[in-house]
A protein has these predicted regions:
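Secretory-pathway lumenal glyco-enzymes, predominantly type II signal-anchor Golgi glycosyltransferases
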Residues: 1-452
């Protein structure tokens, strides 16, 4: 019997044994990386312990990364048919939470009892765009507040009838886009089905911060795992080209470069005034795969100081290195780690995940070594580097680890309610913004330089 069948068999047995909360399935959106697997297991134990103390039975708690062997289950939609087939006969509600989301089960039951379980319901804390957003393909740009999507940190819920309809649709339809970019906005669009399905119902008890009546709340986006890793543990590679030497590069130097232990600018030409390093790869208008693979080869060589971590960014990426070093303390550099903002391609049909390049790609030395020794390579210099790397890691069984603190776009492209509660690590693009002001407002930590 496989591990996954054994786990699912145990969960079903527990479901049948309990009462009271037995109609609730809690899905923790867990990840395969060892740190996140431990955190989600701790959250599961907390939920079950709380249920035992309250004496109202216990819910089923599913760790999403254990549901099946498919890594793409993180994007939720591919997992819904399996979730319904496994638990649909027993459950009335499916609650989706982050590993740092806390539940108050008694309050949650009171909330769910307000909504007839035989109807289609999509519940959560509503977010909406503050303006036209590129990451949402400018959907509802004429009235951004007219469409709401769930705040993932507060959790969200679907009733059994809605889950059933979604599961059936997913087995017979293709998605309009092959890309998974902003997961919860895309889920809300799929549920809404251009007016044929329900919109999100705002539930005040689904909270990002704890209040007296909250059924859910969120602990932290930036966990405290101890002292930040040393500056010298992170090697920073900035991709640039000649036409941006006097435009974008000065922004990097005026903002976050001073917080780096080791940093190099890689360009198509050498410029001693910066300085930049030419890797012998011609500049391309897009993709940059050839340049990125050359950076990784250089990182493993003796040409640069040895470091446990490699951060690859664009020259128009803004970064908080102090927060990144805090986050990296949570991860084991002896493992193959690929960390950043996770996107997906073709995930409904066994596609692959990747760390989007604009927000910054963080790779452990072990991950870089495995990638470069695997034979994976670019089919052209202008191939999309982040997607090629993601496809390679998928073939190697290296999970892509997501952090919502990395951002492929500008602050204006995200819901203000969401990013105002974060301690962001990165934003991307200088278009229509003052990058110095963005860095100062969103990323700069007011600490003495020797404490960063």
């Amino acid at each position: 019997m496989s591990h996954f069948k054994a786990v699912n068999g145990f969960k079903i047995a527990m479901f049948l044994f309990c009462c009271g909360l037995q109609e609730v399935v809690v899905v923790i959106q867990s990840q395969r990386n060892s740190y996140h697997a431990r955190r989600s297991e701790q959250r599961k134990e907390e939920i079950l312990q709380q249920a035992a103390e309250e004496g109202k039975g216990c819910p089923v708690v599913v760790l999403l990364h254990e549901l099946t062997e498919y890594e793409g289950d993180w994007s939720i939609l591919p997992a819904l048919p399996h979730l319904f087939a496994t638990y649909g006969q027993l459950a009335s509600w499916f609650i989706f939470v982050e590993e740092e989301t806390r539940l108050r089960l008694a309050a949650l039951l009171r909330v769910l009892h307000r909504y007839p379980e035989h109807e289609e319901w999509f519940l959560g804390r509503g977010l909406h765009d503050d303006g036209a957003s590129i990451i949402h393909h400018y959907a509802f740009s004429e009235d951004p507040s007219s469409f709401t999507y769930p705040d993932p940190s507060a959790g969200w819920a679907v009733s059994k009838p809605l889950l059933k309809r979604l599961a059936v649709r997913l087995q017979h339809e293709s998605l309009k886009s092959d890309f998974t970019i902003d997961l919860h906005h895309e889920i809300a669009l799929y549920v809404w089905e251009e007016g044929n399905g329900p919109k999100l119902t705002a539930v005040p008890e689904f909270c990002s911060q704890m209040r007296d009546n909250c059924a859910t709340s969120f602990t932290t986006f930036l966990p405290d795992c101890g002292e930040p890793v040393p500056k010298t543990d992170v090697f920073v590679a900035v991709k640039t080209c000649h036409k941006f030497h006097h435009d974008r590069v000065p922004v990097v130097r005026a903002t976050w470069e001073k917080d780096a232990g080791f940093l190099e600018f890689y360009s198509d030409v050498s410029d001693s005034s910066i300085p930049t390093i030419s890797l012998g790869v011609p500049n391309t208008e897009r993709g940059h795969c050839g340049k990125t693979f050359a950076i990784m080869r250089r990182f493993l060589s003796g040409a640069v100081p040895r470091a446990d971590w490699l951060l690859i960014v664009d020259d128009d990426t803004l970064v908080s290195l102090s927060r990144l070093r805090m986050l990296l303390r949570c991860y084991d550099s002896r493992e193959a780690v690929s960390l950043g903002e996770r996107y997906g391609y073709g995930l409904l049909h066994k596609g692959y995940s990747y760390t989007t390049g604009g927000g910054g790609m963080v790779l452990s030395r072990v991950a870089v070594s495995r990638l470069m020794s695997s034979g994976c390579s670019c089919h052209s210099d202008d191939a999309p580097d982040d997607m090629v790397i993601g496809r390679c890691f998928t073939s190697l069984g290296v999970p892509i680890t997501h952090s919502p603190l990395f951002h492929q776009a500008r602050p204006d492209d995200y819901s203000g309610k969401l990013i105002s509660s974060q301690q962001a690590i990165s934003f991307h693009k200088h278009w229509n913004v003052d990058p110095l002001a963005v860095y100062k407002h969103w990323l700069k930590d007011d600490l003495p330089r020797d404490e960063l």
